[in-house]
Amino acid sequence: SKITMESTTRREYRRLGESLAFIKSLDWNAKTVIDIGAAWGTPELLQAFPNAYHILIDPVPTYEERFKAILDRYNGEYHLCAISASPGKTYLSVPGSGQEVSSQLSISQESENSISVSVETLDSLFVPRPLDWPILVKTDCQGYDLHCFKGGKDFLQRVDIAICEVNMFRPTGRPDLPDFAEIVT
């Protein structure tokens, strides 16, 4: 169904679960969900759209077993790669155990706390293939979200809803991660 300003409230939604419940209340249902920066998976997306085809994307290899477990219960696939404006390779800052917040923004070369990862674009992954519509894309890329979208100029024309999980304010203890104002400027 078509969503118009007349059919929506002007309320701010701060939590992903709240936002998805509102979207569902408008009788909208995703057939394809693309979760960029999926890490451990996004339970709110899985629960809101249990019958959708879920595409989980994260470059950190330690999440692979978790992705396999999720896809034992939900229909979909996973990709162990970063998403950016252009394809190639990059170094990813992975603090501690490799299962914490990682970011492409924090590092540009190899270091003790980095891993080399392949980089794809949304266009290279999804333009050549058919996906069931409607499509929802969620990013949680620790400040790299707009870079993801820059590599999806053609694909994004097929996307119905795009959600960026960003920090409104700089996270305590992570001065390398941007806040909302830095991401959108």
Feature locations, PLM:
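Phosphate/nucleotide-binding beta-alpha loop and adjacent structural elements of enzyme active sites
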Residues: 2-185
